[in-house]
Regions:
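Metalloprotease/metallohydrolase-associated module, dominated by Zn2+-dependent proteases
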Residues: 5, 15-92, 108-161
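Intrinsically disordered, low-complexity N-terminal tails
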Residues: 1-12
Length: 161
C-alpha cells in the first residue's frame, strides 16, 4: 500500500473545535514552517522553488505575505515570506503557505518568462497565480485571493470562505 500524501493527510485531518480555532491555538515554529514548505514545494511545485527566508511573527492585517526583491537573498530566492505564528488550524496554515509559494513562483520563476516577452516581473492574483488552482485542488488545497474569517466559522469549508 502506498504512503498517504502528507499534504492531503493534513488537509483531510479532522478540524479542531471552533472554540480552539477562535483562540488561534495552532502555533508554528521554524520546524513546522520548513516541513510545510518542503512538502508543498515537492508535491505542488515539483521542487522548482528555492527555500526563501521565512519569518513568523505577529501579523495584524494579513496571514501571510510574499515580498519580492530584485536582489537575491542568501538562500538563492528573490523572495521573503512573512507568516503569522498563530493559526486557526493546520489546514488554514497549509493553505496560506501554499498561497504565498504561488506568489514566490511568480517572482522567482515566471519573471524570466515575462522578461523574454519584454514585461516586468509581477506578483498578483492574476492568470499566472491561478494557473496553480487545479494542482492545489489535487492535494486538498484551495487557491483563492483571500480567505474570510467570518465565513470560515460559519461553514468550516475553504471553498465557502
Amino acid at each position: 500500500m502506498a504512503r498517504p500524501n502528507p499534504i492531503r493527510a493534513i488537509m483531510e485531518a479532522p478540524l479542531p473545535s471552533i472554540t480552539y480555532q477562535k483562540r488561534k491555538g495552532f502555533r508554528v515554529g521554524p520546524a513546522e514552517v520548513k516541513y510545510a514548505y518542503k512538502i508543498v514545494n515537492r508535491y505542488v511545485f515539483d521542487n522548482q522553488l528555492r527555500m526563501p527566508e521565512i519569518v513568523t511573527g505577529i501579523t495584524r492585517d494579513y496571514w501571510g505575505m510574499c515580498m519580492g526583491s530584485f536582489v537575491a537573498y542568501p538562500t538563492g530566492s528573490y523572495c521573503r515570506i512573512k507568516l503569522s505564528d498563530k493559526w486557526f488550524c493546520p489546514q488554514w496554515f497549509m493553505n496560506v503557505i501554499a498561497h504565498e509559494m504561488a506568489h514566490q513562483y511568480q517572482w522567482d520563476i515566471d519573471r524570466y518568462n515575462r522578461a523574454d516577452n519584454g514585461l516586468e516581473p509581477i506578483m498578483s492574483h492574476g492568470p499566472s497565480f491561478f494557473m496553480w488552482r487545479d494542482r492545489f485542488s489535487q492535494y486538498g488545497l484551495t487557491l483563492k485571493t483571500a480567505n474570510g474569517q467570518k465565513r470560515w466559522f460559519d461553514h468550516q469549508d475553504f471553498t465557502k470562505c
